[in-house]
């Protein structure tokens, strides 16, 4: 008994993760034992669980705490990232309520899988060693593989799930190989110990190879070039609310992990990993911008858009400074909110025969549904980085960090990629406002989509009026990561 009491403090820092795990199991049992349980019931349970976990995270102190032998850490940075992940996951569940019922996916397991994926993301964000990193990554990935193929009767969804699984397994293998190299050359799996060893002994070629493989595995999770090949097919084939989830929360978790790995485990090797990050950032920005131009399916276009946006976020990471990390965090928040709004508009693209996904189907939307068209146009301008919308400030902070760090060519390439990207965003605005009206969509938009779209639109439009809370919160998170 005494032993059990002494272990209680070990578990307290991980209470949000424990709540998610217990909640997922409880909802799973509720769905199994209650006859005719549908996704709406378990979705409401999942949202209540997210609210409880979010409340705990908000009242939790910002102190730095390590537990489970130093493999699990909580601080102000993990709190910031976990709240953003919760926000993205909750939005994905809310956006899917009407869709899953209309598309014959109304099964109680759907929200449970999102909870389990969120649990994996929480573990990734709090990982303080290579083993806990891999555990969190795999828990997230296994849930996402199943969600991608959740619409069993749809061959595109099944194909998307299979592609994601095969390529995800390859990326996990690369990450694990890199982790084994790092462990072999440093003798430790804990980030702090790895940093200490490298500080004392200096760098060697084996550790550099290890970093390359670990970054390859993590770059896959944020769809960064050249590990982006799965993204367009999976985004197009997966059910639309699932695509909205993929485009938000997993990217936040993987970016948090990249930040912690590079700045906590390998600060002494900044000159080595900075070159890799600069290459990935340039390749992602340029390929994402040019590849999206020829797309006719709006979900494929959003896939290439997400590749490009992760490239922009990595510009701040490449700077290797506290200002750069702050820029990354602000960029991620703005990106997640804008993304949720765009996918609400995509989910409103429904006719009598079902959901449509072609960009040409938006023709004349301004005459049929002027409010939806206005919101979509505003979000497109924001994604393009037009001031004074939120998207402009996201890019401004990461480009300024790159300039202050002396990475002038990277900042210039980023600005040019933004100009190219503006073309395909503005093409959507042109189609909505100036093309001949197509057959109108079913009206009105479901209430839950209207709510998420409204929040996204207000944030995007009025962010410039009062950006201080987000800037201060991101600065506090950066101070926790880089004391």
Swiss-Prot record:
Question: What is one GO biological process annotated to this record?
Answer: ATP synthesis coupled electron transport
- Superkingdom classification of source: Bacteria
Q: Which keywords annotate this record?
A: Cell inner membrane, Cell membrane, Membrane, NAD, Quinone, Translocase, Transmembrane, Transmembrane helix, Transport, Ubiquinone
Q: What class of enzyme is it?
A: translocase
**Which transformation does this protein catalyse, written as a reaction?**
a quinone + NADH + 5 H(+)(in) = a quinol + NAD(+) + 4 H(+)(out)
Question: Main site of residence?
Answer: membrane
Question: What topology does the record note for this protein and the membrane?
Answer: Multi-pass membrane protein
Its quaternary organisation is: NDH-1 is composed of 14 different subunits. Subunits NuoA, H, J, K, L, M, N constitute the membrane sector of the complex.
Write down what this protein is called.
Answer: NADH-quinone oxidoreductase subunit N
